[in-house]
Regions:
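Membrane-topology segments of multi-pass transport proteins
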Residues: 1-5, 38-336
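A structural signal for multi-pass alpha-helical bundles of membrane permease subunits
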Residues: 2-97, 103-105, 109, 117-121, ...
């Protein structure tokens, strides 16, 4: 190989690699965004990759990464002086927090907030001038907000149950909140009653160095029969430790366990909901609950018709488990928010039917144009090609009126029946390919007694497989990604295909970027997998179609 050829190939491969990287960036961004939690999405500094979860062995704790990066001058002195201002506000620091380390982080947090709120002209002055301008802004409320950003505390609030008749009851309301659940692992966790902004809750001080889990249990009397129990809710504040909260329920002599854990991600108050299987699971409503699966009869289980036993278990996560929880969290949320598999079934049905009808109708019509002799063939072929010149927007309203008059509105019929009549473009592609097939094969088959349909089925179709594969791929992508058709013809959410279902999902979650990207990735993967495995047929089909005729 000559030096010129080496340089030529090097440049060619470099351009191909660069192009691949450039075109892969949007997909990489979608994939990384799909596994981010909300605070990463709305952070003031953009970061392509998700932040690594940090499992904690003890809690409560300080998150020293929240204000790890600061911008602005005088970073060596001002954070400590802001910490002194925080002390001067009289903010009540919890006794179980390290005061020195906490105020140090709060000083950094106040510095960051002042850097973003004060005019930049002030920051060109001395440290004393900056401190003087910032002092009126350092209030107890401001300090409290900064403290909430760096302090992580696992807390349990009230537990509520609801019956099928919508009777709501707070469990253990006659007891202090820290005594409503019995501590089964005192060597791991200590329960303390605390209050914050008028809300009473149980603070969990834990240490997983001896055991990797803690367990809290409680037996409660219900105001209704346990058979009517619909859902259980726990108001809690996670501590961003990425641990796993599991629930098991005993009632009516049976034990029920959660099918998956509630992940202790983020650090704002949230509601964890568990519910037994029921009609809601197959409905189109947003599923904000975790299913409780029936484990069958259990020895010693509560059997009183108006009594229930709850067992909450918090399990410490390793770094690998925490990463798995983070990678799957948003995807579980997507599957909970929409009837994803119902949408997938509809899309798969449409894909299979449309591909089958398109391949059959287009190949049969192309065969008649390419191999059969009949009066007006060329005129009909030109007329068919002329239909490609008509913009689809022109025929959109007439199509809608026709389908509505036929009673097919709000059914799947308009989304697949039209494919039984072929596609002008695909017919043209197949005709060009068929015209390149030697007529000797057809003549030999006729001598053997084959009619035109048998020739079509046994001779022509096997020879045009690459082109059929290309058409199948195009049809798959068009049907899988079809948005306009369902938008026009479908009103019943139960009939939504995946593309339109994800649009409705994006509206429901107010275009939350992480959830939207997770849903989009789930929709994109089948197309990518199909093209990856079928690219040889796709390239072969398009190439041969282009050179035949």
């Amino acid at each position: 190989m000559t030096p010129t050829q080496i340089v030529h190939k090097t440049v060619l491969y470099a351009l191909l690699a660069t192009g691949s990287i450039v075109f892969a960036i949007p997909f990489v961004w979608m994939a990384t965004t799909s596994v981010k939690v909300d605070r990463e999405l709305f952070a003031e500094r953009f970061q392509l990759t998700p932040v690594s979860p940090q499992p904690r062995q003890t809690g409560p704790y300080l998150d020293e990464t929240y204000y790890a990066r600061l911008e602005g001058p005088h970073q060596d002195t001002l954070p400590d002086r802001f910490a002194e201002l925080a002390r001067a506000t009289g903010f009540s620091l919890p006794s179980d927090m390290d005061a020195l380390a906490t105020y140090r982080q709060m000083g950094r947090g106040l510095y960051d907030k002042m850097w973003r709120s004060l005019p930049k002209a002030i920051w060109t002055g001395s440290a004393d001038a900056i401190l003087l301008a910032a002092s009126p802004e350092i209030t107890t409320e401001q300090v409290s907000r900064v403290f909430d950003n760096v302090a992580r505390r696992l807390s349990f609030g009230q537990i509520q149950v609801r019956s099928e008749e919508l009777i709501t009851q707070e469990l253990g309301s006659d007891l202090p909140i820290d005594r409503r659940l019995r501590n089964e692992t005192p060597e791991v966790v200590t329960l303390t009653e605390r209050s914050e902004k008028g809300l009473s809750f149980t603070s969990l001080t834990y240490d997983f160095s001896k055991r990797d889990r803690l367990r809290l249990m409680g037996t409660f009397n219900l105001a209704f029969d346990v058979a009517a129990l619909q859902r259980i809710q726990l108001y809690l504040k996670p501590d961003d430790s990425w641990g796993e909260l599991w629930l098991s329920v005993e009632k009516g002599g049976k034990r029920y366990t959660a099918e998956r854990p509630f992940i202790l991600a983020n650090f704002s108050w949230a509601t964890a909901t568990w519910q037994e299987p029921g009609p809601d699971d197959v409905s189109t409503k947003i599923k904000t609950w975790i299913l409780l699966k029936d484990d069958g009869p259990a020895a010693g289980a509560v059997n009183d018709p108006r009594q229930i036993k709850l067992s909450f278990e918090v399990r410490h996560s390793t770094l690998l488990q925490a990463w798995w929880n983070k990678l799957t969290l948003n995807y579980y949320r997507v599957l909970d928010h929409i009837p994803f598999w119902r949408y997938v079934r509809t899309s798969v049905f449409l894909v299979l039917v449309n591909i089958s009808l398109t391949l059959f109708s287009c190949s049969l019509v192309a065969y008649s144009f390419a191999r059969l002799q009949w009066p007006g063939r060329e005129f009909c072929f030109v007329l068919m090609l002329a239909t490609m010149m008509i913009p689809p927007q022109v025929t959109m309203i007439p199509h809608f009126l026709i389908w509505k008059a036929l009673g097919a509105y709000d059914t799947l019929l308009p989304l697949w029946f039209g494919h039984a009549f072929g596609s002008a473009f695909f017919i043209f592609l197949l005709r060009q390919f068929m015209k390149g097939i030697p007529r000797d094969l057809e003549d030999a088959a006729r001598i053997d007694g084959c009619g035109f349909l048998r020739i079509y089925w046994h001779i022509i179709l096997p020879l045009i497989k690459p082109s059929l594969a290309t058409i199948a791929i195009f049809t798959f992508m068009a049907t899988w990604n079809d948005f306009m058709g369902p938008l026009i013809y479908i009103a019943d959410q139960r009939l939504y295909p995946l593309a339109f279902g994800l649009y409705a999902f994006a509206v429901q979650v107010s275009n939350n970027p992480a959830l939207t990207m997770a849903a989009g990735l789930l929709m994109t993967l089948p197309v990518m997998v199909l093209f990856f495995f079928a690219q040889r047929y796709f390239i072969q089909g398009t190439t041969l179609t282009g050179i035949k005729g």
